[in-house]
């Protein structure tokens, strides 16, 4: 970073501050992770200089012989990782990947069935404030109040009533295994496409620890960060019959030039994800989430769906008399990063909320195992139950710092 320091000391100083925040804080945001040095180095390479509109062997610019090899390798690796017929690695984000599928398979005004945002879905699954909800006629399913699991009877009922062109499965705050076979069954009953957004669980799927949606879905989208631990970006996987439509939708339909430095970084992360070490890492992610959920249950917290089968959990704070916004802010003060999150039937608005979403991918990358996770659960409880006790918060902050110093990230 010496060149950044010399050229732009202001930006360098903020990068240093962000490094310090990551190094000295406990990261529990479920959608965040720590990329390897190799992933970051590929993203910071000379490939950032190259324009490459089009696809390997079919570019609109010369000089693409090497970036063609990079993109071909990224495609080959991600297809192997998920046993997919076809992959498009050009989406700049998960949202871009989702919009690419919609553009390929739908027309404006088409009816789509997706998971409600306040029941664990995502903005791009038809929220009225998102382009998906403005361009398409979305209807939403949710979870059962007693179990917190997807209400498949309601999914089937809505599908038969509205005859959607597409059903979207996948979530951003759902802690249980998703039954893709039942989604496929319902989609077939009404003649709908099935799209699965596996952004949150892609790493678990790659490791064989969550059912793979690829055999069931017509289209699968994912981010490449989160549990995959790559750079920020997206991917679309699809059956061979949809290859042409997907590629045409991503370029020239939705995007211009691909980010070749990011695609190189994706390729590196896919190589990492094919390793046995990555599978062991994902096993620990799930163990840590299970331990954290159990510890919080034992401390008297209400968890949506009662616990976790994957990398995340949703904590309902209503019985604790604390809003998600307040808990997030005070936890941030002691260097524990979480995100406030709506819970089902939340009486609070989206900027306040009654819950927290917690995840274990980042702390597991750091090296935390069961003992450290138990300590984290105790810290969460001490902060949430002692929000106004400044002495308590200072002690918690020191405990967080000491714990993080035992597990350094990028600088030994």
Curated annotation (Swiss-Prot):
Its EC number is 2.1.2.1. InterPro entries: PyrdxlP-dep_Trfase, PyrdxlP-dep_Trfase_major, PyrdxlP-dep_Trfase_small, Ser_HO-MeTrfase, Ser_HO-MeTrfase-like, Ser_HO-MeTrfase_PLP_BS, SHMT-like_dom. Its cofactor is pyridoxal 5'-phosphate. Gene3D superfamilies: Aspartate Aminotransferase, domain 1, Type I PLP-dependent aspartate aminotransferase-like (Major domain). The record marks 225 as: Plays an important role in substrate specificity. GO terms for biological process: glycine biosynthetic process from serine; tetrahydrofolate interconversion. Keywords: Amino-acid biosynthesis, Cytoplasm, One-carbon metabolism, Pyridoxal phosphate, Transferase. One of its GO terms (molecular function) is glycine hydroxymethyltransferase activity. Pathway: One-carbon metabolism; tetrahydrofolate interconversion; Amino-acid biosynthesis; glycine biosynthesis; glycine from L-serine: step 1/1. Its main location: cytoplasm. It is an enzyme of class 2 (transferase). It is found in: Cytoplasm. It catalyses: (6R)-5,10-methylene-5,6,7,8-tetrahydrofolate + glycine + H2O = (6S)-5,6,7,8-tetrahydrofolate + L-serine. The keyword Cytoplasm applies. GO terms for cellular component: cytosol. (6S)-5,6,7,8-tetrahydrofolate binds at residues 117, 121-123. The modification N6-(pyridoxal phosphate)lysine is found at residue 226. It comes from the Bacteria. Catalyzes the reversible interconversion of serine and glycine with tetrahydrofolate (THF) serving as the one-carbon carrier. This reaction serves as the major source of one-carbon groups required for the biosynthesis of purines, thymidylate, methionine, and other important biomolecules. Also exhibits THF-independent aldolase activity toward beta-hydroxyamino acids, producing glycine and aldehydes, via a retro-aldol mechanism. NCBIfam families: PRK00011.1. Belongs to the SHMT family. PANTHER family: SERINE HYDROXYMETHYLTRANSFERASE, SERINE HYDROXYMETHYLTRANSFERASE 1. Homodimer. This is Serine hydroxymethyltransferase.
């Amino acid at each position: 970073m010496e060149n950044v320091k010399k050229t732009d000391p202001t930006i360098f100083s903020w990068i240093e501050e962000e490094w310090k925040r990551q190094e000295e804080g406990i990261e529990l945001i479920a959608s965040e992770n720590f990329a390897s040095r190799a992933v970051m180095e590929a993203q910071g390479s000379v490939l950032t200089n190259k324009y490459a509109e089009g696809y390997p062997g079919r570019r609109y610019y010369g000089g693409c012989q090497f970036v063609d090899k990079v993109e071909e390798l990224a495609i080959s690796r991600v297809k192997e990782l998920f046993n997919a017929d076809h992959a498009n690695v050009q989406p700049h984000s998960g949202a871009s990947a989702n919009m690419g599928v919609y553009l390929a398979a739908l027309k404006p005004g088409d009816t789509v069935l997706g998971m409600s945002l306040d029941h664990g879905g995502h903005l791009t699954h038809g929220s009225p404030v998102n382009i998906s909800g403005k361009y398409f006629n979305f209807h939403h399913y949710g979870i059962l109040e007693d179990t917190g699991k997807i209400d498949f009877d309601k999914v089937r009922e809505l599908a038969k009533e509205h005859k959607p062109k597409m059903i979207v499965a996948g979530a951003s705050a759902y802690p249980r295994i998703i039954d893709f076979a039942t989604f496929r069954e319902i989609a077939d009953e009404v003649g709908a496409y099935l799209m699965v957004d596996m952004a949150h669980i892609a790493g678990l799927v790659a490791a064989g620890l969550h059912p793979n949606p690829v055999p069931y879905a017509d289209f699968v989208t994912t981010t490449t960060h989160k549990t995959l631990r790559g750079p920020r970006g997206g991917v679309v996987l699809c059956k061979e019959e949809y290859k042409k439509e997907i590629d045409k939708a991503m370029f020239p339909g939705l995007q211009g030039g691909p980010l070749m430095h990011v695609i190189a970084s994706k390729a590196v992360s896919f190589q990492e994800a094919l390793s046995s070490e990555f599978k062991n890492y994902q096993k620990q992610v799930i163990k840590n989430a299970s331990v954290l959920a159990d510890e919080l249950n034992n401390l008297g917290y209400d968890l949506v769906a009662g616990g976790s089968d994957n990398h995340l959990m949703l904590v309902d704070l209503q019985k604790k008399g604390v809003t998600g916004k307040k808990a997030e802010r005070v936890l941030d003060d002691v260097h524990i990063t979480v995100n406030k999150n709506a819970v089902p039937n939340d009486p609070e608005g989206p900027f306040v909320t009654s819950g927290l979403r917690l995840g274990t991918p980042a702390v597991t990358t750091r090296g935390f195992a069961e003992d450290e996770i138990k300590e984290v659960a105790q810290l969460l409880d001490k902060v949430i139950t002692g929000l106004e006790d400044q002495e308590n918060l200072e002690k918690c902050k020191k405990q967080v710092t000491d714990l993080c110093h035992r597990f350094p990230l990028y600088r030994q």
